[in-house]
Amino acid sequence: MLILTRRVGETLMIGDEVTVTVLGVKGNQVRIGVNAPKDVSVHREEIYMRIQSEKDNENGPQSY
């Protein structure tokens, strides 16, 4: 895992098209903004895991 330090208002780049900007810090919460192309999905981890779980349920158990 790459660990970076950023201050409010500073941005980091992921590839050529995705930016992540620190918008604010209050207590133990950090607000970030993500700029990404429309074809790149951006989700909080818990939402992503729910989506993956729902996909697995739609496919049903696999028999071999």
UniProtKB/Swiss-Prot annotation:
It is found in: Cytoplasm. Its main location: cytoplasm. Keywords: Activator, Cytoplasm, Repressor, RNA-binding, Translation regulation. GO terms for biological process: mRNA catabolic process; negative regulation of translational initiation; positive regulation of translational initiation; regulation of carbohydrate metabolic process. One of its GO terms (cellular component) is cytosol. GO terms for molecular function: mRNA 5'-UTR binding. Belongs to the CsrA/RsmA family. A key translational regulator that binds mRNA to regulate translation initiation and/or mRNA stability. Mediates global changes in gene expression, shifting from rapid growth to stress survival by linking envelope stress, the stringent response and the catabolite repression systems. Usually binds in the 5'-UTR; binding at or near the Shine-Dalgarno sequence prevents ribosome-binding, repressing translation, binding elsewhere in the 5'-UTR can activate translation and/or stabilize the mRNA. Its function is antagonized by small RNA(s). PANTHER family: CARBON STORAGE REGULATOR. Homodimer; the beta-strands of each monomer intercalate to form a hydrophobic core, while the alpha-helices form wings that extend away from the core. This is Translational regulator CsrA. It comes from Tolumonas auensis (strain DSM 9187 / NBRC 110442 / TA 4). The gene is csrA.
